[in-house]
Amino acid sequence: MSEKKRISIDPITRIEGHLRIDCEIENGVVTNAWSSGTMWRGMENIVKGADPRDAWMIMQRICGVCTTVHAIISVRAVEDAIGAKVPVNAQYIRNMILAAHSIHDHIVHFYQLSAMDWVDITAALKADPEKAADMLKGVSTWSLNSANEFRNVQKKIQALVDSGQLGIFANGYFGHAAMKLPPEVNLIAVAHYLQALECQRDANRVVALLGSKTPHIQNLAIGGVANPINLDSQAVLNHERLMFVKACIDRLTDFINQVYKVDAAVFAAYYPEWLSLGKTSGNYLSVPEYPIDADNSKFMLKGGYVENGDLSTFRPIDQQKDEFVVKGIKESGKHAWYEDDEPLEPWAGLTRPKYTGWQDDGKYSWVKAPTFYGKVVEVGPLAYLMCGLAANDTPTVSHFNELKGIYEKLTGNTLTTDQLHSTLGRIIGRTVHCCAINDILSAQWQMLIDNIAKGDMTAYIKTDIPANGEFRGVGFGEVPRGMLSHWVVIKDGRIENYQAVVPSTWNAGPRNEQDQMGPYELSIIGTPVADPTKPLEVVRTIHSFDPCMSCAVHVVNTENGEVTEVKVL
């Protein structure tokens, strides 16, 4: 007789809101799942009636982590509605901010937010620092991959253990049966975790210098950016500041290529089973990003759509406002706590809350369920990777092949495209995405320098909001967690309606109008769970989508009502 249990992991929190995952586990395997966003956003209602020029400043408050991306995509939506042109200098500056923000996001996710799902901190005490340094020879030239550095890190870990307080490493699933890294790899990972804390500061320095501060940048405007350019002035974007940005980019490049890329390959090498777990629908959607002209028509990063995991079905998306994309998006509230059940296009979308309590077969989430031509779609770095490989995009293919080469050198095995439809495939996709946008960050810096050298200092074109009439616009972007879109209706100079379809909506959504599971839900079906009170395996896959994390999760045993507190790192 089969044994069935239900667990509730609540909350797995993210900055956009709080996430609850419910699972039914039968004979040690997840057989059913529900993904529930447990906090209502409602930001769309806040901007109704507001001046469209203020929307970006308000909408970036949706999130405390992805602030920058919401600001930029909101500006694009209003600019699209009124037909505003953007000077190329402004595009370059926006792109540098977006790229640096995305690099910061990816580094923080891999090391600070998800690495502890795979790394046993205490096992690092058993490592041989000399052996750890030798393991990386031939795959990395990072200067801090030395026995002395690893020995110092080991001493720090020992001091934490001896104090009885593990600090930032407290409350992990250390000793869990699913932890498989050798002691030396655990030590390497902890060392790189600590080094990443310093490295990610360089990415934030770029955002803060160009955006005036971070989080919540201040330099945007409809029609450009508020960054006066004068190479000889002390108070604006000058030669000194631009060279400071270049120094930050150079340091980021070294860390990303010699540490981050290698570590992702190492994780894949030691956890091969996670190259077969975590698959969703196989439908992937991404949009082009990093515009380099005033009309938002030429981009440095390609987009596209892949269906059923078959790269031969790839359809390129060359424009952010491709009619194929705009017409395909609808959101359903059938299983969400809103009044309107039928799928609606975002311009007509309504945000009318209707809380009913949890209903397995009814409404159970504050997140709506987006579909693309009626299909469940995954967005994010894996979607970017699959579309980039299908398009034979040069930077995507190049960086993937480098990571693949490291994996094959470590294992002697071939990393196939079919294995990418997985939990670790998602992490590999994020790594490749980070490498590609780091190249773009460097290129955008050079393009800005070259354009200034030609005498072009323009960064803003004054644009008025029409006082009369109705205008509709949409801003798209390919941001760290995937395709983001903001949809605005402007009437008589004010915002009539506003909807944001965020990456987390696509991936964390509940069942749709056809009762099809969302990506989070699909991804954990078939996942083995060794210990229901420590559901590390479920958390690994959910974290691979890059939700921000909570420090405390509660697992409820419905058989006896016992609540077991579980700390998630």
Q: Where does each model-flagged region fall?
A:
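Active-site bordering "gate/hinge" segments
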Residues: 1-481, 492, 502-569
